[in-house]
Amino acid sequence: MAECGHGYRSQRWEAENWIGHRYPFKVMSFVELQAQYIREGRLNLDPTRNQKRVTFHDPCNQARNGGIVEEPRYILRNTVMDFVEMEPHGAENYCCGGGGGMLSMTEFASERKAAGKAKADQILATGAEIVATSCHNCLDQLDEVKRHYKLKVKIQNLSELVANAIVWPKPPESEESSQEAEEKK
C-alpha cells in the first residue's frame, strides 16, 4: 500500500529489483483502495459534506506511470458536490514541479516556482476553491505554488475529502443507556 505517487512508483516497479524477488501480492495505491471500498459499498458517503468546488491535480507517478486516472475522479464524484477538471488532465496534466526530488533541494526553489506557473494558471482557470491531490510531494509543492502566486485556494489530500464525506454509523445504544433514558422520562 502506497500513499504518494513516489512511494507507489518505488513499491510497484522498483522495490522488487532491490529485494531480489517478486512480491506475493499486488501493490496498490491508497487511491485504488479507496475507490474499491466505495465501489463495494464499504464506505457510506455524503458528498453534501464537501460543498466547495474541487479540482484534482494528477500526480505524475500515479497518472502517467501508473495509469491511475479514473479512480480519483470516481472518488471525487462520490465525495464532493462540485468537481471540475483541469485542462489538460489525467496523464496529460501539467506536472506541479515538485517531483524527482526537486522539492527537497532548496537550491532549485526558483526553478520549482517557475515550473509552478503553468500549474497556477491551470488551477485559476477552474475556479476551484480546493485543489485535491493524492501525493504528499505534490501537496507540498502545490502549497508552495499557492503561496508564491497568491492563489486563493486550499490544497488538500484527496483522502481528507473522503474522510470528511464519511457518514459514520451511530454506535449501538447499550442496554444501560436505554434504561437511563427511560428513567429520565
Describe the residue ranges of each PLM region:
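Iron-sulfur cluster-binding electron-transfer modules in prokaryotic oxidoreductases
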Residues: 1-185
